[in-house]
Amino acid sequence: GKTTLLRALIAAIPANERFGTLETDYELLVHLQPGRSNILALQARVGMGETQDGRRLGEYTVADLIPEALRQNLSRLVVGEVRGGEAGAMFEAMTAITGTMSTTHSHSAASTIDRLPSRVAQGGVLSIEEAYRQIAHHLHLLVHIQLIDNTWRGGRRDRIVSEVRQVTGGIESSRPVTHVVYRAEDGRTSYAPD
């Protein structure tokens, strides 16, 4: 669901606009789509062999790809899936390029506000407080995809947009302020502003 939504959002980017994707594994495959010749698709590389300074030989992470991407005069940057160390790379991209998108695992759009800073702090890139400030300043929307599994009663598995939160740019009690702009209730959709 997350990757499908991200692909749909990418499809809205004009074909002549230069943008890049950074992924641990090629999942978006935007660079293979017809009419997408003005794209920089970079993939991380898993190292092997013995480790040097805590890294495997030949390892090239998403964070390592950021400087190369920033040299390419991109209008947007898509960081595939943010699981751990990619969080710092995503934050670096957000501060350098005006249009960024990414996906991550979280229980709700609201819980993403706490998950991202803790992932960034684990990588030692920013403190949690600095990460909260970066979220408030650089993120605009948080979209949550939910799996609805009705196979137990003969139905099917559906993924729906269950919540959309706007990040206002403000901070209260050291956390970014968000407002619900959309929420699905019991599989039904509704506009539900805070």
Question: PLM features: what roles do these ranges have?
Answer:
Residues 2:
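Conserved lysine of the Walker
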Residues 136-194:
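Conserved P-loop NTPase
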Residues 8-136:
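Switch/coupling sub-region of P-loop NTPases
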